[in-house]
């Protein structure tokens, strides 16, 4: 973590300039720490250009000469900041020569002598060795300098395949046979990594730049430094070259005509989408779709794997491949059974390649229009004339469809930059007016901010350019530009009269937020594919079984079967007399339940012989169902306060009865067990665990000259600086925040035997006083979403659950590289040491008392194991993206999730000092009354009813509420026959 942002930026600027002027005649002395400093601040360092700026500043010549560098010919290798010797592998997986294994914390450097200066494309020949199953990430420096921002993060794909029961060779392709559950439904196949040697050029990770990313090399000796950010990689070689771009279709066709190519006749090969042989992502597995009788295969009763893609095939760079062969060499047309019903009024784009090459320019960015229903689309030009593809017979051909932003890439890039500038303008305005300006006051905005009009005009022009480009691309008039038009019109109004900001500030903020939503949606390019038909030009491409009669009969059949199918049951369903059988309740969504069930069937039942019936239910009915004898054996995703309360009512099993519990406890941080233990009993195992972190905006802190705070005293200093600029520290009042302050100040929730509250101790009262002062003395917002204010910059530092990281990764592409996170601020102790403890909360998995206990315990041990939690976490990310990253409580599994190394280090630092909040009988009254006391102290007089307008100190309020807490604890302990305080 970098402590002084301004200092870092000065160092970065000097560092960058020094290497710009240094001779490239020797290897650089670039250290890992220096690399990390550059990567930490590259988005806010003005000395590091964007790709567009870099291209404009350098000559555009592209020499013909190519350079190939063996990976083993490196000049320097570091592990962290220490020089090391990497592992060298010879002849690995059929590859001749020596390859170098680079770790996820490595730096490897090469010296390259360039004969002719110019732009060169860089490609890596690599093998994706086993890691955390996420994309490999690297950054690239040339002669000690990060050439431009896009090279700070380059991703290299892994290759995935479906695990199948068997495969059957059909004419021209390979069909897959799926495992089935005992209801006849296809099981979703497990994806497994199928690594192979890959040659990959450097490309923009966001897809905003559709071309390869070239680098300008000076003539003479240069150094190329590759810094690992995530995942290991086996590197065989590096190439610098300039391959020719694809030619236009007319030239492609003319060249093959000249070579004697002719259309074939009467030939057709159909590739089923679900039989994709390779994909770039775990997310791209077969999809079960029963929406149309035109799909192949399809059933009104059963769930069959019959398509691929949809919402899971939406991110730039994701690709799917099929292998096929044709009986004759010649020209073929390609038809697709597709549906793009995800982005109304918009196109989605795919790059189509055959045998690793884009056949002609038009396939770099092929557009698929919106359609509510399945349709057959033949790849055609703007005049609906089918494209003809020359395909060789007698070889295995590979067809790849890759998601690209295509024509929209430049538009999206412009809008992203515009949003950043619009938020910057918003922050300038609120520094003058505050977030709630007086609409009748003249703030003299134009005089105070003379540069504002020019900035708004520049953003308006950029948005206008984006609008025009959208209209050029979208000739159907889908209306994709409406949000941008509204923003442009508002800017025109404000340019004419900047004083109107005082009246329309909320409208401006909402319009910027709408642009952010538009950006998120525009970046997604979903497409669902049923089949690919590679046919002779004289063979008609069409949907089968798609008449009105077929559709009516199919829908009536679906309706009929819906009366007999129990949709709450997932996968295999076993009777109680089929050996050991347990019932599992899952309280999350169907996607999660399907993943859990598939893991159970593939692993747990197969290994143990214990059958598990999975049911998707509302967990609020758990206690009632158990008391009625209709409950499950095991329940997952249970709230952390339930196990102890259920245990006292003899509704769940005390796990301390199992001899191997101490061994299982070692999987978790001790804090994760705290909520589930009471009076010597253990009522649950932790399933998830999360805790707060400090999120901060690098760009805004740099503007203000602020450090990332280490202590709460630092936070208070930062608050004063933020207040001067009408910004604030974002921190919503909640139990985790209060408990964090309580623990850091030496307080406890309860006394040693949990028979009374300890919140009225001096430590507890002091913690409560500090807690309330943030909202009385520093006027922090108590209700507005901190995430939204973080994005706009109103709150450039926030305290939020660490899972917020996942949300920002997905929902804030405009802030990529401009934010970071760190452990929560610490409290300075009397001896000068820092107490940085953070409170955590845990989700639980429990065994009900009326259960098959031994079988249920076997399941719980399996479910919380490292292997299972890693598989579940990766499956969820493959299904729903990084926003669904599971906050697993298993420490080893947590370390194996695909966190970038720097982010994991920050999380691990906080994970090493967390504490759980204990649960006791009547404990639900504790924070409820703390919260009541909090609002009594912090609510302004004018918001209180007249009878309640009595000024109360934090000490008085909390002391009064502790009396109520103790009364409730005493009452509950008497009900359960537990010793009472003082008796």
Show the residue positions of the predicted features.
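Hinge/lid segment of periplasmic solute-binding proteins
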Residues: 563-578, 640-693, 714-716, 816-825, ...
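Extracytoplasmic/periplasmic substrate-recognition and gating elements
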Residues: 116, 328, 812-885, 912-919
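Periplasmic solute-binding protein
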Residues: 646-650, 669-708, 727, 733-755, ...
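Extracytoplasmic "Venus flytrap"/periplasmic binding protein-like
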Residues: 600-671, 675, 699-707, 796-797, ...
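Glycine-centered hinge/linker elements that transmit conformational signals in sensory
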Residues: 753-783, 824
